[in-house]
Amino acid sequence: MPEDIKFRHYFVDEAGDLSFFNKTGRIIVGQPGVSKFFMVGVAQIADPETVTGELNALRARLMAHPRYKGIYSMQPEAKKTAIAFHAKDDYAEIREQVFELIQSFDIKVFVAIRSKVEIAEVARANFKSLGKKLQQNAIYDDLIKRLFRNLLHKADVVQIAIARRGKEAREEALEQAINQAQKNFEAKWKISSNSSILIGPAYPSQVAGLQIVDYYLWALQRLYEREEDQFFKPLAQKYRLIMDLDDKRNKGYGEWYSDRNPLTLEKLRGARSK
């Protein structure tokens, strides 16, 4: 391909779950095993090949290290760290080394966050008044549209790897959501985009960039769910935009964190009464 063709590489994953109610219709958000927030993140990685090589090299060194031989997640049959880094499953010492490595990569991270209590209360009201059930995929697709609205017009070829959500194949729906994001940008700014958009659902073991965005989301999730900022702080400069859509203390569309408004634990505390 000609050298003047501009590429953008994006990697998409989620954190949290989309569980809202028990079998009797009671809201269970925040109970053990159920997250308070749901977030979707996009990592823009300048050089995916280098990232892949360095992550694979780190994994190979760790797999060969005697100290980690007996750790279950390092065993090939466990299908965890041995095939892909995953912040939730990785041994603490290994997680530290992954965090240290990914800080050096040329990465920009964009995240959209929903408070599940807010979603659940609206959903319950809609069901009572209209008989309308909550559509979980619609929540995910809406965040995809918000994230990609301003990310699709700066390259000739946009390659998007999206972490598979369970066994469900939703390529067509994701393509529609991303195409709508492109249309929303054009409608707002009156700028047309001729980018060629290539979308491919994948597993983190297949695409190293998905392991990167998983780590960034895990660090942010710990900040939101547990008010722990020790993982977030070293990575903070890489998060270019965090859209907290249900924190409407100051603006009706939510709180947007960026260089102009850096996210801190102090800002999150007291953000919601629920």
Regions found by a protein language model. Give the residues of each.
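Phosphate-ester processing/binding pockets and catalytic centers
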Residues: 1-274
